[in-house]
Amino acid sequence: KSIFERDRRDWLVIPDAVAAYIYEAVNKMSPRAGQFLVDISQTTVVSGTRNFLIRETARLTILAEQLMEKIKNLWYTKVQGY
C-alpha cells in the first residue's frame, strides 16, 4: 500500500502533538504558566472547538476516502475497461 493509504488518518493527531510539545516547553520554563495552559485547555470554548474540529476533520476524511474510491472505480471501469 502507498503511504497515503496506510497513514491517511495519522495526520489527525498532529494538533494534539503540537499542543503537547508547547505544554511541555512552557511547563519546563514555568510550571505556573503550564498549569494556566491546562486550565485554559479545559474550558468549554476550547474543548468545544477542539471537538468540532475533530468531528469535521473526520467527516472530511471519510468523504475524501469515498471520493478516491469512486475515482479508482471510474478509472478501472471506464479508462482501463475492467
Swiss-Prot record:
GO terms for biological process: lipid metabolic process. GO terms for cellular component: chylomicron; very-low-density lipoprotein particle. It comes from the Eukaryota. InterPro entries: Apo-VLDL-II. Pfam families: Apo-VLDL-II. Found in egg yolk and in plasma. Keywords: Storage protein, VLDL. The keyword Signal does not apply. Belongs to the apovitellenin family. Monomer. Protein component of the very low density lipoprotein (VLDL) of egg-laying females. Potent lipoprotein lipase inhibitor, preventing the loss of triglycerides from VLDL on their way from the liver to the growing oocytes. This is Apovitellenin-1. The lineage of its organism: Eukaryota, Metazoa, Chordata, Craniata, Vertebrata.
